Amino acid sequence: MRLAAISDIHGNLHALHAVLADIATTGADLTVNLGDILSGPLWITETAERLMALALPTIRGNHERQALAPDIAAMGASDAFAAERLLPNHRAWLAALPATLQLTDELFCCHGTPGNDLVYFLESVDAHGMRPATLAEATARAGDAQQGVAHGVILCGHTHVPRALQLADGRLVVNPGSVGLQAYDDDHPHPHVVENGTPHARYALLTRRSAGWQVELRAVPYDAEPAARLAQQHGRPDWAHALRTGFVVETAQAAAPIRPVTSRA
């Protein structure tokens, strides 16, 4: 079996097209979408229509939950931009998405962790910024294999950082990274930035071999300039810079007490 995992598209239709084209060359049997699909200053309607037509196995992320809340005025800028443009059929589609998905007997999908769409699975944030999670931290988030998620492979998203980690009990946790946005800053639970260092669209390709699962964290080139220009037109120069470079602007970098982890695919 060969599986493509995509996540965190954030309305970047051009990056999505590039990733889907690359997936088509790999012979993947199935593609799964791990959420955070539309929120951002880009192509909301067009991305929704493209994905609804594909009918991929899909879960919701925190941004789907947030963008469907009733009070648009209380939303962050990215969710509000999406919420104002969602058509009724888009809302119905997003509302029907599950928070987690058992894709096969071996494969389990979540956005953040199995129990929380806002928690980073393979990274941790403290007063010093963001760092890779320890094995103990990741294992705690996965839960006891006997009582919680016992599947051999757990797919997650949310952080935009492509990474794979095998737990001591043999379970494999894979984050494919983000299709649509390669850098951002956040202040929860502490100020930190995430930077992948290039504008490439990310996804993961998993292939079942006799010895276990082979994981490829793929970085796909695409022309990010139209997305950057659109973000700029919609009043988001921070997104424009991140889309062009894979880095946050210097003012956001200065907000993190220690230089964050940079993942380069």
Residues of each region from the PLM?
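Core catalytic region of metal-dependent phosphoesterases/phosphodiesterases
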Residues: 2-95
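Active-site-proximal beta-strand elements of phosphoester/diester hydrolases
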Residues: 1-10, 106-113, 173-177
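Redox-cofactor binding/interface segments in oxidoreductases and associated redox assembly factors
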Residues: 33, 156, 175
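Active-site environment of divalent metal-dependent phosphoester hydrolases
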Residues: 10-15, 39-42, 64-69, 102, ...
